[in-house]
């Protein structure tokens, strides 16, 4: 039985609210199961929420296939060889599911044994941290459906995994909203924690996903990732760009071989609803669990075994999936969610937050900016900053020097172009790079992020995020070619070409939903010589500066007065967090070296915002040294293995702590810095990690490790030690 420390009255309120919630279809109940004082008696039935469409139910035996590893087991997930597909251009739904789980798990987790996979974490490590000899496969059922608003355009995918070992006597639900712009299995590594705890896992793709609308052939993805024509799919399409046939024909004539992606081109600003979609996943989970337990039939008068008042529900995930979990908790007026445990969350704070961040007693000049603000800033400066001699040994910087995948001198060209545009004052390349790096630090990146900038630039993370989020926030149509960007495959001359048939057929499972991805590139439509891959293009200055024109166009949307700028500014305003978690126990974990979502623009200032507005706050923030945003890079990018520890381990520990608090009343740790030790050694062959490299957070951190928050005169000050 969950204790819900300090929320006894809240539990009674939850019971009283069940009738109202059920009547509206909020949780799929037609009545409530009573409250703690037993003054109310009604007869609940299991009513499918009104927003849920046709439901598909599949059981996995845990031998040939399973919930966590898709039948691959721990060894299969660790293998560098991806699962095979019998017909590469026509994969089955089962093959696509297996590919999706394989690719998404590996994208979020370092699967190298030396990094801790199989010993500190991974499918074969049980809920208590014990290494087992098993494969880690989990038998159980999946319930899958669309959530739609009746338009057939929303079609957000909801999925609930219920392990066969689900404990109805101690029920729990964990949310695992997809990270990034990924598909439904985009937070499978979060789901792993829940499955091991015998919890149900509530997933949603939150209106993103990797399968594109190929405009040239007018084919679209279905819910299971398979593809068909837009006409044949109709309202069952997971995504089809909202275009008339006439518009599509004209667009294809003017800009052939382009693709539309749901996050960028749905014209719905899905981010504003990520909290709502996460709550819908929880509601769907309650219905699915009771449907399974009742054998698919819950007659009137039967008592529902699993209800909000007897079930531990933890909102969780990572990256912007973690931000969605926090949004859900803030928006949860019906008390479905009991606690929050998230990793490296994407959080947009209001400009009026009145929070300042200090590190080592020094107030930082720029903090608490929304994602599009700081990522569009990085999109301009990071490529140049990574050329600074102070970070010459950073992972992937040698790839630029060797012109591997990038034009020669592109970093120096970017520095010079920034100077020509009046954005850098220095006159030599070396000084310009140093100046750009200092600008990054001043705008909120910690010095610990310096060694990550080169790889962020090399993998085009800033232009990909800025372009997709710019389109999404502005509700831009694919027809708009916002800032003259588009998405396409390219030929050997870097010009748009027909997308590879195999890549397209499997893209829903191999891509991340935010180009560049799986053979789809960012295109500069205004490049000299015709539309060209953005990083290879020659822009208006006549140089290959990785399309600075496009980067500056995106940046200007923040302050512009034209229709696109105003639409984007409105879109951002619809995604801002309130900071009020309603007194729920909550842990945020983030790596200090995070260069995608800098700690000074998310977790740190959110702690201050929460302290101002949540009078019964139980939020703690754990900042981990030597940890960055992409655990999947630790084994992928030489040098990451020597520098960084796996953050996934701390995300799982945060879930452990919040669960123990809700279940047993175990106190949460106070906010603190956890000081880890990198593995060191030679880039690409670091020694095996040891438990001593990754100490746990503690309930009694040293004074020098404590993170504190004070509120005075309407301003919250977050103090972080060096």
Curated annotation (Swiss-Prot):
Known catalytic reactions: (3R)-hydroxybutanoate dimer + H2O = 2 (R)-3-hydroxybutanoate + H(+)
Primary location group: secreted
Record key words, sorted: Hydrolase, Secreted, Signal
A GO cellular component annotation in the UniProt record: extracellular space
Regulation acting on activity, per entry: Inhibited by diisopropylfluorophosphate (DFP).
UniProt-listed GO biological process terms: butyrate metabolic process
One Pfam family linked to the record: 3HBOH
Signal peptide coordinates: 1-25
UniProt pH dependence: Optimum pH is 7-8.5.
One Gene Ontology molecular-function label: hydroxybutyrate-dimer hydrolase activity
EC numbers, comma separated: 3.1.1.22
InterPro entries for this protein: OHBut_olig_hydro_put
Pathway: Lipid metabolism; butanoate metabolism
Top-rank taxon: Bacteria
Location of the active site: 319
UniProt-annotated location(s): Secreted
Family: Belongs to the D-(-)-3-hydroxybutyrate oligomer hydrolase family.
Entry function: Participates in the degradation of poly-3-hydroxybutyrate (PHB). It works downstream of poly(3-hydroxybutyrate) depolymerase, hydrolyzing D(-)-3-hydroxybutyrate oligomers of various length (3HB-oligomers) into 3HB-monomers.
Protein name as it appears in the record: D-(-)-3-hydroxybutyrate oligomer hydrolase
């Amino acid at each position: 039985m969950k204790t819900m420390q300090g929320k006894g009255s809240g539990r009674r309120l939850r019971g009283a609210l069940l009738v109202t919630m059920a009547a509206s279809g909020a949780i799929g109940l037609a009545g409530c199961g009573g409250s703690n004082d037993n003054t109310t008696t009604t007869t609940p039935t299991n009513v499918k929420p009104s927003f849920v469409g046709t439901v598909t139910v599949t059981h996995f035996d845990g031998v040939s296939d399973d919930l966590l590893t898709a039948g691959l087991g721990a060894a299969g997930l660790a293998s560098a060889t991806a699962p095979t597909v019998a017909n590469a251009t026509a994969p089955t739904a089962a093959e696509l599911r297996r590919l999706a789980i394989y690719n998404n798990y590996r994208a979020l987790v370092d699967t190298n044994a030396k990094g801790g996979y199989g010993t500190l974490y991974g499918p074969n490590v049980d809920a208590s941290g014990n290494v087992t000899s098993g494969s880690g496969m989990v038998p159980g059922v999946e319930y899958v459906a669309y959530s739609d608003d009746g338009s057939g355009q929303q079609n957000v995918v909801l999925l609930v995994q219920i392990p066969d070992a689900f404990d109805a006597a101690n029920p729990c639900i964990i949310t695992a909203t997809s990270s990034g712009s990924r598909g439904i299995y985009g937070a499978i590594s979060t789901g792993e924690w829940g499955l091991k705890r015998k919890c149900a896992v509530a997933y949603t793709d939150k209106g993103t996903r990797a399968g594109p609308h190929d405009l040239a052939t007018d084919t679209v993805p279905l819910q299971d990732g398979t593809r068909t024509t837009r006409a044949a799919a109709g309202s069952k399409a997971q995504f089809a760009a909202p275009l008339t046939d006439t518009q599509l024909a004209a667009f294809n004539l003017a800009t052939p071989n382009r693709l539309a992606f749901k996050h960028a081109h749905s014209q719905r600003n899905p981010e504003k609803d990520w909290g709502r979609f996460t709550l819908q996943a929880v509601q769907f989970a309650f219905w699915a669990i009771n449907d399974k337990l009742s054998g698919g039939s819950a007659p009137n008068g039967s008592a529902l075994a699993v209800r909000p008042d007897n079930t531990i529900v933890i909102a969780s995930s990572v990256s912007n999936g973690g931000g969605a979990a926090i949004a859900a908790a803030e928006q949860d007026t019906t008390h479905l969610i009991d606690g929050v445990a998230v990793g490296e969350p994407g959080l947009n704070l209001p400009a009026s937050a009145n929070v300042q961040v200090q590190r080592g007693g020094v107030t930082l000049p720029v903090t608490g900016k929304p994602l599009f603000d700081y990522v569009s800033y990085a999109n301009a400066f990071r490529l140049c900053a990574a050329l600074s001699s102070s970070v010459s040994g950073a992972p992937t910087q040698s790839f630029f020097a060797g012109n591997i995948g990038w034009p020669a001198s592109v970093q120096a060209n970017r520095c010079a172009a920034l100077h020509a545009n009046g954005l850098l004052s220095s006159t030599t390349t070396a000084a310009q790079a140093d100046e750009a790096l200092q600008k990054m630090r001043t705008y909120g990146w910690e010095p610990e992020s310096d060694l990550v900038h080169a790889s962020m630039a090399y993998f085009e993370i800033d232009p990909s995020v800025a372009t997709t989020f710019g389109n999404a926030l502005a509700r831009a149509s694919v027809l708009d070619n916002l800032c003259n960007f588009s998405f396409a495959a390219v030929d050997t001359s870097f010009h748009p070409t027909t997308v590879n048939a195999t890549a397209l057929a499997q893209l829903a499972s191999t891509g991340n939903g935010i180009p560049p991805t799986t053979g789809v590139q960012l295109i500069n439509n205004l490049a000299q010589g015709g539309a060209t891959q953005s990083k290879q293009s020659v822009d208006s200055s006549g140089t290959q500066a990785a399309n600075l024109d496009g980067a500056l166009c995106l940046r200007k949307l923040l302050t512009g007065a034209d229709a696109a700028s105003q639409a984007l500014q409105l879109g951002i305003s619809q995604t801002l967090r309130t900071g009020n978690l309603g007194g729920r126990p909550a842990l945020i974990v983030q790596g200090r070296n995070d260069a995608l979502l800098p700690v000074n623009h998310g977790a740190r200032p959110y702690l201050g915002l929460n302290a101002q507005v949540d009078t019964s706050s139980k939020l703690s923030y754990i900042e981990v040294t030597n940890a960055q945003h992409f655990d999947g890079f630790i084994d992928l990018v030489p040098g990451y293995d020597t520098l960084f520890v796996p953050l996934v381990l701390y995300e799982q520990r945060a879930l452990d702590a919040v669960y123990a608090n809700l279940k047993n009343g175990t106190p949460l740790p106070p906010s603190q810095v956890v000081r880890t030790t990198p593995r060191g050694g030679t880039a690409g062959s670091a020694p095996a990690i040891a438990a001593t490299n990754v100490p746990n957070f503690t309930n009694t951190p040293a004074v020098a490790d404590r993170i504190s928050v004070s509120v005075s005169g309407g301003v919250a000050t977050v103090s972080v030690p060096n």
